[in-house]
């Protein structure tokens, strides 16, 4: 007993339960030290464990000399505790969980076969193999909600704990219904495919028929052409046969057009009428110069209370054309017959001059001088026309004004004449504008602004064409004039600087001065 001195103060403790696993020994040399924190524990009650005393049933220590020791009490406590745990586990167990295989068994490796559990029952540890061997695979019915739990095989003595909500008959009927539905859907697919194939075949047959027909018609047309050319060998000459063929093709085209569009007949007739007209008479075309002239006359003549209007390009063009033709018809009346004669003579002179210049083979310096003299003559004519229109405007405007004095009547014509002749804007500022204070300035301003909006795009076009005309004459000096198109001729006719300079001066002057006074 030298190695194990039982008189030595020793205490065996466990974290979970006293007297069981994980024994720890606290030794102390003195008895005084041992009794400091554990005064209530008696000495020599528990001894060191004997390794031979351990058994698989539990921890049973060798009885000591002191009689009945606490080891027997510990064993009884352990047995009672384990029984209590087992009872609690059975009470808490859900009967539905018996269908689920044991988690510990599922985690075991698959090569382990039947094993003995603590209850003595035989349990198979591989649930996948069990399902493959015992359960037949069936399609899952759509009515069941959630995955189906695997059933656990039980012994004959133990009653079944599983409660199946769906019977086997219902499963069989559901699987049969699914099979029937699958067969029906397959049949429908087959029918759809057959219908599609039939439609495709019909389409191919139709396309082949149309191709055959088109070939036949082409062959017939060739035959007809050959007949037309071959039949009249004795009676008609070759030229006559070709002529006849052309007429036939014309008629055929016309018939095709009539078939394609029912309204094409009228168009065809209109085209024929127009072609006949153009053959007999020359189409009267009003030049761009007349268009400009009519615009200026409208600017001078109109005396309504105009509001400023924004014109788009297409509307402006339409308005221009309408005004041109209306003005032309007005000039042909009895009152303005002399003025119309002057304008028409101007136009004729210019056209004749340009026609001669285009086809002349002489030096261009002579032509250029002639053109300059003609422009001067036309300027004088234009000034006469504009002055006449300004006087008319003055009479109309100042008759409506409140009590116009003689001074106003005397000053205004000179003012208007000067305004139309002046080119420089600085000279315009020096002109007497005393009459503006006695005329309604808002009316004058509205009139000027509206007219400026109408005439501004036209003036920009005129400036561009003037530059083009100048470049044209500079490039062709000393050379023969080429055969220019009618467009360049029309642009040359626009070469009158006094027109748009006078208009810009008047409108800008009225705009600035009236805005200052307002």
Curated annotation (Swiss-Prot):
Biased composition annotated in UniProt, kind: Polar residues: 13-22, 68-85, 123-134, 142-157
Region feature Disordered, mapped onto this chain: 1-169, 200-232, 252-280
Composition-biased stretches (Basic and acidic residues): 86-97, 202-211, 269-279
Low complexity biased stretches: 113-122
Domain of life: Eukaryota
Protein name: Uncharacterized protein C04E7.3
